[in-house]
Amino acid sequence: MKDIEDLIEKAVELQSNGLISAQIADELNISRETVTWLLTRSKKEEATPAPKDISVDWSSIGKSAKRLHNISLALCDMVLETMEKVNAEVDVVVGIAANGVPLASMMAYELDADFAIYHRKGQGIVHAGHRGTISRNFGSVAGKNCIIVDDVITTGSTSMEVIEQLKEMDAKPRVVTVLVDKKGVDTIYNVPIQSLVRIARVD
């Protein structure tokens, strides 16, 4: 129960710092549904069941450039294995802001590829016709083989959004690579998912 209380405390603190639910979900690597539950749960309401979610804390990796580099090497190895199967080269590594960017930049360096950043619009709040964008300050993706990098897949909605956006820009999304896959799917829109860790709930 201590872990739940810690998550509630962190969620409340982030909210008091002005973050919205989607940003809190990104920061704590949990679903938006879980954030809502944490923020609305009173200490007396023990009967309310928690959403089925798993919190992922990878800060022990994120705070060390050396560890980030070593993890990026493992992700590169998985990407190259996938790219060999489709006989394609990596042209651009696209990091999903904010948590995918450090890994993506290191991977781009290791793979001798261009580097691009995808900024989510509204931090994951979905409105018809409103999506994120590829930053113009970094590599171009048009007509290129793209690798998508993020830290955690929870629902897959961000990966879907990036894949759709890349296809609209005439890019070729080839693989999505993450540290942790909480959704447990092999592909999203026929793009392979490669993760260091895949989590499966057994209920």
UniProtKB/Swiss-Prot annotation:
Keywords: DNA-binding, Transcription, Transcription regulation. It comes from Methanosarcina acetivorans (strain ATCC 35395 / DSM 2834 / JCM 12185 / C2A). Gene3D superfamilies: 3.40.50.2020. Belongs to the purine/pyrimidine phosphoribosyltransferase family. GfcR subfamily. Transmembrane segments: none annotated. The gene is gfcR2. It comes from the Archaea. This is Transcriptional regulator GfcR 2. GO terms for molecular function: DNA binding; orotate phosphoribosyltransferase activity. Pfam families: Pribosyltran. Disulfide bonds: none annotated. GO terms for biological process: pyrimidine nucleobase biosynthetic process; regulation of gene expression; UMP biosynthetic process. The keyword Aminoacyl-tRNA synthetase does not apply. The keyword RNA-binding does not apply. Contains an N-terminal DNA-binding winged helix-turn-helix domain and a C-terminal regulatory domain (or effector binding domain) resembling phosphoribosyltransferase (PRT) domain.
